Amino acid sequence: MTKKVAIILSNEFEDIELTSPKEAIEEAGFETEIIGDTANAEVVGKHGEKVIVDVSIADAKPEDYDGLLIPGGFSPDHLRGDAEGRYGTFAKYFTKNDVPAFAICHGPQILIDTDDLNGRTLTAVLNVRKDLSNAGANVVDESVVVDKNIVTSRTPDDLDDFNREIVKQLQA
């Protein structure tokens, strides 16, 4: 059975932080599904990239996926604003069950809501690092960081390293 990666997304995502990893995942032979507030709704990136949500967060089951991708931009902030905390709960399945979770730029913000960062080593864009540290993470300034099943990266400049590690983790 082909491995499938969930991508949680809202408006104002950083376009290249969605399109580049998604392309790398699919080129490696894996499937992706966009998960958002409403199935079949359009979400628009900061630079105009438009994508359609495949599955609503209400209907998504994390156990149906072999990995989780969280692109950056302002999308993670919007997702964290979900009154029911559904995106953090969804992500927690991956962090708690050693299923790969990939987050770049502002994406690691979602991982804060898993309450599973204490002692984990992560990276992120500069203005998210303090929040990660306050959540108990050991924060470093590296292009890509792997801590067990969590893979984090800083910015679009690091996408080559990030994409390579995503594919490596999915092929393991």
Curated annotation (Swiss-Prot):
Residues 3-171 form the PfpI endopeptidase domain. It comes from the Bacteria. InterPro entries: C56_PfpI-like (IPR006286), Class_I_gatase-like (IPR029062), DJ-1/PfpI (IPR002818). Pfam families: DJ-1_PfpI. NCBIfam families: PfpI. Belongs to the peptidase C56 family. PANTHER family: DJ-1 PROTEIN, DJ-1_THIJ_PFPI FAMILY PROTEIN. This is Uncharacterized protein SH1084.
